[in-house]
Structures are given as C-alpha cells and as structure tokens.
Amino acid sequence: MEALKKLAGVTAAQYVTDGMTIGLGTGSTAYYFVEEIGRRIKEEGLQVVGVTTSSVTTKQAEGLGIPLTSIDDIDCIDLTVDGADEVDKAFNGIKGGGAALLMEKIVATPTKEYIWVVDESKLVDHLGAFKLPVEVVQYGADRLFRVFERAGYKPSFRMKGDKRLITDMQNFIIDLDLGCIENPFDFGRLLDQTVGVVEHGLFNGMVDKVIVAGQAGVTVLEANQST
C-alpha cells in the first residue's frame, strides 16, 4: 500500500513547474508529493513556493527546504495536491482523516488546479463508509454532539489518547458515522448552515484531477470528463 501511495504522490509532482505557487497537502499520500517536491528542489533546482495545509506539513516542508508563504499573502495558488479518504464517481470526496480539513479547504478554494492523490481503495460508489469529519468550535460542542445524535448521525468526538483532539485551529472534530450519504451537496449545505460547525469534510465539486495508484499502475481521472 505504501508503494502505491508513493507512486501517486510522485506522479502528481510531475505537474509542478518552475515559478508555481503550490498547495502542499496533508496525509499519508500527500506526504510523498511533498517529499518529491523537496527532492526536485534539491536535485533539479526547482523554483516554487509552497502553502501548507497543516502544522505537520509545515514541519515536513521546512525540513526539506521548500520555501513557504502564507495563504494571507497570496491571491491564488497554481496547483494543490492533497489526499482524500473517499472519492465517489461524481468526484465528490471526504477528507479530514488527518484532522486538517479546515486548512485544506481554505487552501483548495483559491487553487487553479486541484489534484487528489489516492490509492484505488479510496474509490467508492457512494460516500459515507468513511466517517465524515466535522470541525466544530469548542464552545457548545457537547450540545452540537447531542443534536447530531438525535438526528441519527452516530457522532463521536475525535480523540488523541484519552482527550479530545484539538485541531491546528483550536477546534474539536466530531466524526459522523453515516454509512451512506445519498446527496453530498444537500448534506454539505445542511452542515454549512449549522451554528457551531466551522467546516466539514465534504469536498464537493472541487477537484480537477484524481491520480489513482493501483496494482496495474497509475490512472489519472479528469473530473470534467465525468458523466
């Protein structure tokens, strides 16, 4: 599995060219993309500037000597490469297994070309088997948990050891065990309108390409060619 993830990440790095501002994703597959960018900077003299999606990726990028800038200092990003936990046939996805969904979506929004790198196990017919992360403010989180519980969403707080995980933005994450999300757009809008929800892990209609690594090699799926 690690070999497939590395293959997807290295393939995505081929889309990066000199002068780009690039979004550096978070997670086990995006990790290899960031590593390959670091290698190309060192060995090929690649000239890029990165914008990171988590403190973990920031630390990785700094260790590799990748020049970084703040999302607040730029208007657009040429290319962002990130992982995904599930991708359906309509190119909607669930992200946030690494608890970085808020920063990931902030970086994805001003991106000209948004690429996901996944192994073939992440391709699904319907989203929802992977628990949907919902980032919530700490104030009122238990009340919101009960709201989700009454709605039948089977919520659970994301934990780190015996304490609730706190995200880079100092929020909690409530994971929803939905089983199947029939309409990701409708459910995303419902969460967007829920007071106390900062962001959710539904990335609907955002991705341009999905690079899939499987036993037979790498496949590049183009979202605009989907039916």
Swiss-Prot record:
Pfam families linked: Rib_5-P_isom_A
Active site residues according to the UniProt entry: E104
Tree of life domain: Bacteria
Broad class of enzyme this protein falls into: isomerase
Reactions that this protein is recorded to catalyse: aldehydo-D-ribose 5-phosphate = D-ribulose 5-phosphate
Record-listed E.C. numbers: 5.3.1.6
Pathway assignment: Carbohydrate degradation; pentose phosphate pathway; D-ribose 5-phosphate from D-ribulose 5-phosphate (non-oxidative stage): step 1/1
UniProt KW keywords: Isomerase
Classification via InterPro entries: NagB/RpiA_transferase-like, Ribose-5P_isomerase, Ribose5P_isomerase_typA_subgr, Ribose5P_isomerase_type_A
GO biological process, one term: pentose-phosphate shunt, non-oxidative branch
SUPFAM superfamilies recorded: D-ribose-5-phosphate isomerase (RpiA), lid domain (SSF75445), NagB/RpiA/CoA transferase-like (SSF100950)
GO terms, molecular function: ribose-5-phosphate isomerase activity
Binding annotation for substrate: T26, G27, S28, T29, D82, G83, A84, D85, K95, G96, G97, G98, K122
PANTHER family the UniProt entry points to: RIBOSE-5-PHOSPHATE ISOMERASE 3, CHLOROPLASTIC-RELATED (PTHR43748:SF3)
Function: Catalyzes the reversible conversion of ribose-5-phosphate to ribulose 5-phosphate.
Subunit architecture: Homodimer.
Record family assignment: Belongs to the ribose 5-phosphate isomerase family.
Classification via NCBIfam families: PRK00702.1, rpiA
Protein name (record): Ribose-5-phosphate isomerase A
Organism: Streptococcus equi subsp. zooepidemicus (strain H70)
Source species taxonomy: Bacteria, Bacillati, Bacillota, Bacilli, Lactobacillales
Gene name linked to the record: rpiA
